[in-house]
Amino acid sequence: MIRFTEENGALIAHSRNETIRIEGWGNNALRVRTTLLKKLPQDAHALTENVAHSAKVTIAEGGETAEIVNGKIKATVNGVGIICFYKDNELILQEYYSYYYGSIRKEAICYKIRSREYKGLASDDFKITVRFESDPKEKLFGMGQYQMPILDLKGSVLPIEQRNSQVSVPFVVSNKGYGMLWNNPSTGEAAFGTNITKWISDESDMVDYWITADDTPAQIVTNYTECVGRAPVMSKDYLGLWQ
């Protein structure tokens, strides 16, 4: 079972070998970090900007579940560590967990597949996989620039790495009213299947992702750029420059 605590407005969950930290990070947004290491890494990665939030943590009586709310978005964690996200109290994203006790999915719970998987490497890092339930009717957009004639990414598998003619920006916007950043600088893969969604990091010391919920894609992107930074306005001195 998991033990829940609150630390400076963040929801902390400790299991036997994993630490989960969920905290407000900007407007209507949450940052989720989990690790098997004794100390949670403090790297900001892409979340470079100082942003305010109004997150509030509630731990249920008896300590079996907990939640954190920041504006329009809410995250809940149950006794085995399954994280669910809600926009205005409507479920928008749920971790995939099929491992008997504690499972909350409607389909089979006997696959022995956990939401977050850490495979040890010859270092303090892991190959990390995070799984989410998939809505086959969902539409997904973003992820940078890939050489393919596909707008809706549902059903696509995308390598997360920079290549000649490919720019990977692991931020995706859903028509269900949320945007998610895979906040990890390592190479990896994003698989947006109709039956399961997977984010994979080839080598990392923690799970790290950021999620926001809002009413329009423009508001979602605004929340995102508030946290990762915005390009400065070009000086008029450079307008009309020919090279």
Give the location of each predicted region.
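N-terminal accessory segment at the very beginning of proteins
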Residues: M1-Y238, Q243
